[in-house]
Amino acid sequence: MKILVLALRCDRLPLRALFIAACGMGLTFIASKTLAASPVGLWYAEGGAAEVQVFPCADEFCGRVVGLRSPLGEDGCELRDDKNPDSALRNRAIIGLLVLTGLKPIDDDQAAWSGGSIYDPASGHTYSCIARLEGNDRLFLRGYFGIQLLGRTTTWTRVGATQCQSVNR
């Protein structure tokens, strides 16, 4: 009689293990959905000429210039937003300038955003913007007027230990 009871308990063991494994896979799936690709972080823009901090703002993503390779102009003064079409804003420092706003996730794509705008302080122009993350360390941004065909794509590289050695600073 005791042997039979042990046999029944041993038969249950594979079912328990299967149940635990299934729960673990389910949790992994949920975690992967919650930890979807994100543009949040520090990025080298324009080949390392600027560092932009991308952060969540409401239900969107925004980006602010937090560093420049050459923060001073020819006159030795801090670079200003002197190309801005609004003359009242031309005295703003480039460092600290909000250059990326309004990026919202595209419904089906976990690593793409649209509906945003990107400001180019070098020209004073603001463009419509879409973004796509490739892997975890490359962010492609396309700024355009009207239709995406009439635009330019730039690649930002996430700042990290390996990039610090490979980007000329």
Enumerate the language-model features and the residues they cover:
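Bacterial N-terminal signal peptides that target proteins for export
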Residues: 3-22
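N-terminal signal peptide c-region/cleavage motif recognized by signal peptidases
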Residues: 31-32
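K/E-rich alpha-helical interaction surfaces of small helical-bundle regulatory domains
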Residues: 37-51, 152-161
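Central antiparallel beta-sheet cores of small beta-barrel/beta-sandwich binding domains
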Residues: 40, 48-128
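A mature extracytoplasmic/lumenal domain signature
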Residues: 47, 56-58, 65-67, 133-135, ...
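Residue-level recognition of beta-strand termini and adjacent short loop/turns
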Residues: 107, 135-137
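Edge beta-strand at a domain terminus
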Residues: 145-169
